[in-house]
Amino acid sequence: MKSYISLFFILCVIFNKNVIKCTGESQTGNTGGGQAGNTVGDQAGSTGGSPQGSTGASQPGSSEPSNPVSSGHSVSTVSVSQTSTSSEKQDTIQVKSALLKDYMGLKVTGPCNENFIMFLVPHIYIDVDTEDTNIELRTTLKETNNAISFESNSGSLEKKKYVKLPSNGTTGEQGSSTGTVRGDTEPISDSSSSSSSSSSSSSSSSSSSSSSSSSSSSSSSSSSSESLPANGPDSPTVKPPRNLQNICETGKNFKLVVYIKENTLIIKWKVYGETKDTTENNKVDVRKYLINEKETPFTSILIHAYKEHNGTNLIESKNYALGSDIPEKCDTLASNCFLSGNFNIEKCFQCALLVEKENKNDVCYKYLSEDIVSNFKEIKAETEDDDEDDYTEYKLTESIDNILVKMFKTNENNDKSELIKLEEVDDSLKLELMNYCSLLKDVDTTGTLDNYGMGNEMDIFNNLKRLLIYHSEENINTLKNKFRNAAVCLKNVDDWIVNKRGLVLPELNYDLEYFNEHLYNDKNSPEDKDNKGKGVVHVDTTLEKEDTLSYDNSDNMFCNKEYCNRLKDENNCISNLQVEDQGNCDTSWIFASKYHLETIRCMKGYEPTKISALYVANCYKGEHKDRCDEGSSPMEFLQIIEDYGFLPAESNYPYNYVKVGEQCPKVEDHWMNLWDNGKILHNKNEPNSLDGKGYTAYESERFHDNMDAFVKIIKTEVMNKGSVIAYIKAENVMGYEFSGKKVQNLCGDDTADHAVNIVGYGNYVNSEGEKKSYWIVRNSWGPYWGDEGYFKVDMYGPTHCHFNFIHSVVIFNVDLPMNNKTTKKESKIYDYYLKASPEFYHNLYFKNFNVGKKNLFSEKEDNENNKKLGNNYIIFGQDTAGSGQSGKESNTALESAGTSNEVSERVHVYHILKHIKDGKIRMGMRKYIDTQDVNKKHSCTRSYAFNPENYEKCVNLCNVNWKTCEEKTSPGLCLSKLDTNNECYFCYV
C-alpha cells in the first residue's frame, strides 16, 4: 500500500492534476488521433494508460509481471482525461504515439513546438525538430553511418552516395487528416498529385546546440534560417524555398507516420490546424527508403520526447515491442533493465543471469556476447577480495579513510561539516599524514617522491586541503582515488609538472596561406545534384568518399556531430585504452602521438593494444643522456616509425620513466609489430595548415575569425580517427589539483609546452544559463589526476582571450589496412533493445533547454523534496544525499569548499520509461537531481531493495564498496556477493 500511495503522489505531482485522473483501475482508450481499433499502444502524454491491460513492471529475475521496485505490489494504472485546456497541455508531454494496426510502424502526433526522437531498433534513427520542420534520418549500419535529410530528398547520405529510384514524393491526402487506417489502406492514404517543389538543399545535420559563439552545423532547408537581404540592411528578409509541402507553425499540429512495407521504409509527414478545415492544404510529404533485406529485422520502436514546464523536466521513453521471438523470461530480465533507467542493457542483463545463477547453457545466454559466454566460469569465480593479499595497498586504503574522517569537523547542530583549519591539526592526524605518504611512496611508480622532496605534516595537510576545495562536488570514492596522487606529499607541490610536459613545437611553414572557407562547408557533389528529386533512396548502397570509407565509425549513438564520448561504451576499443602516466619525464609528445595512432587502429577494426612508449623514446638517432629532460614533437614519432618500420606493444617493452635514455632494444621474435603493413602518407596540403610527411597541423590562431571551421575540423577527425593530438600551454594553468569534471573556461597562449589528445566533445549549460560546448581531453598524468585522467575545456573560451586554449591540433595521415577479422558482433540483446549512451539523454535535455525557464533549487529544498517522495519504490534513482556514512562524507566535501553561491542550479529531471508489448504497458520512473546526474554511466541510487525500508542501506552498501567492484566484469554481481543478508539487487546500478 505504501508504494501504491507513493506512485499516485509522484504522478499527480509531476503532471497537472486536472489532466491526469488518478484511479486504481485500468481504462480502455484509443490513440486520440485515429479511429478506434486502427492503432494499438499508449498515448505519449499518459503515464501508463493501456488499451488492453494494466501497467506493471517485473521483479528482478522473475518472468511474471510484477513491480520491480515495490517488492511485488502491483503498479496502478493512471489514465488520461480526454479533455484538457490549453494551459493544462503545457504541463504534459504532448507528443502522442500509437502502433499501427495493419502495418509494422508507428503514428506520432502533437503540436508543432514539440520535438521527439524515434529509433527503429536496431538500425534506424529519426530526429524530428518540429519547430524548424527538420527531419533527419541516421542509421547504425556500418556501411551507412551518416545522415539523410527528409527534406532534401537528394539521394545523399552526406558523404555516401545513394541510388535514387523514381517515385512521387508528395501526394494529396484523401479523407480525414487524422490519418485513419482503414483495412488495407496505407496510413495517411496517398493519391497522385503534383510534385513538391525541389530545392537545392544538402543533407542537414543536427549539430550541437550552442550559444552564438558556439559551433553550429549548417542545417539546409531550415524554416527558421533566413537569406541575406537582397538590397541592403533595410530590405525585408526572404526565407529560402522549402522542399516540403507541410511546414510547422505555431498553433498547428503535425502527424508523422513511419512504417515498413516489404523492404521499404516509408515516412509520411502532414501539418494541419487545430480545427480541421476542408479548404486546408491536403498534401502529404512522403519519402521512401530501401532497406537491406539481409540485415536483422526491426524488433522494436523506441520513441523519446522531452518537456520542460515550471521547473519540471520530463523525459519520456517508450519502447514498443514489434515481435515476441525472444523468450519471455529473457525479455523480462532485459525490459527490467530498460525500465530501471540503466543505459547499459547488456551489462545489466548479464548481471541478472549471473546473480540468478543460471548456467551458461541457459537460452538467455545466447543474447550476450561470445566473450561473456566463453569466460563464464572466470566471471563467476571473481571475488570481491582479489586484491586483499596486497598488504601495503590495504593499509594505504585504510590510511586514506582515516584522513578523510579527521580532516572534517561537525558543527554544533550536527548537520553540517567543514574542513578543519591548520591550527586544528592534532598529533594523531599528523602521524597519519606521514604514514600515508610513506605508504604512497611504496606503491607509486611515477617517480614523484623519488625526485622531489617530501613535505612535512603541514605541507601535506595544505596540499590535501587545496585538493579537497578544488574537488568539492566529488563523491567519496572519487576523493579517495585522488588521494593516490603522490603530488600531495611534496614540499613544493607546484614542482610536480616541471618534468611532466615535453612538447617542442616543430619549425614548419604554411604550405597554403589562404584559407579556403568552402573546404569546411557542406556542399553537394555533381552526383548529389543528379540525385535530386523525389522517390526511393537506397539506404544500403556502399559508394562513399575515401576519407570515411576506411574507418569504422558505426558507433554513432556514442559519437556523432552533436556529441562524442566513446568512453561511455564499455565494449568500444577506445574505451579499453587505459590512461597512462608519463612519470617524471618530458615525454608527453610520445604519449599523445602513440594514443592517436592507437585510436586510429581502433577505428580500423583492430583490438585495443597499447604501443610501447619506451621503444619510441629509446629508438631515435640522437643523444640519449638527456632524453627525459628534453621534449620533442609528433614529427619525430613519425620519423622513428619510418626509420625502423616497427612498433612493439606495451606488453613487449613496458614503459618505466627511469629506463628512458637506454639503447634501442633488439626486436625479439615474439614481439608484435603494430605497424605491420602501415604506411606514412605524403603531405595533404590542406588549406590553412602546417604540413609535414604524414602530419597535418592546424593552429587555432589562423582560425581566429572562423572558429566554427576549426571546431568542425576537430569533430570530423575525432569521429573518423578517434582522437587528435592537441598542443596546449600547461605551465601555470594545470596542477595536481586541476578539476576534470567541471568544464574549464580557459584562455590559451601564443606558444605551447604540452601535448594531449582531444577524444570527444559535448554540450553544457554554464552558470549564466548559456548553451556551450566543450572538448573532452585526455592527459598522460595518470588516472588519479583530473577526471580519471581526462578533463573538459570550453571549445571557444572566454570572449576576451587573445588565444584559444587549444593552440594547435595535429592529425596523422597514415594508411593502415582495415581489419575485419576481429570485429566483434554486438550482443544479440541489442537486436531488441537500443544500445544507448548517457550522453544521448543529456543531449536531449540540452537541445530542449530553455534559458528563460530555468529553475533554481537549493540543496535544502532538494532534500525536503526527496523526503516527500519517500523511499525509492517507484522513482528509480532517488537522491539519498546525507544517508549513510558515504553520503555524509560526500556532502562534507561539498559544503567545505565555501562556494560563492549557496543556491546552485539543480534542474529536476524525471525520466518516465514504458515498455509496451502485446497490448500491456509496464512502467518505471527515475529521478535525476541535476543534469550531470543524467550523464552518469553508473549510479548507486538505482540499487533495489527487496524490502523498501532497506533502500538507503542498499545504496550505502553500493557507495562504500563501489571502488572494490568497479573494475570487475560484473560490478553488480560483485556487490551482490558483499550483500551477505541478500537484501539488495545491484544489477541496475
From Swiss-Prot:
Thiol-protease-like: annotated span: 571-989
Positions of modified residues (Phosphothreonine): 541
Region (Disordered): 26-91, 165-245
Any one cellular-component term (Gene Ontology): symbiont-containing vacuolar space
Pfam family, one: Peptidase_C1
Region ranges (Interaction with host VTN): 365-382
Record's compositionally biased regions (Low complexity): 52-87, 167-180, 191-225
CDD domains, alphabetized: Peptidase_C1 (cd02619)
Glycosylation sites: 168, 310, 820
Function: Plays an essential role during the asexual blood stage development by controlling the kinetics of merozoite egress from host erythrocytes. Specifically, prevents premature rupture of the parasitophorous vacuole and host erythrocyte membranes.
Protein name per UniProt: Serine-repeat antigen protein 5
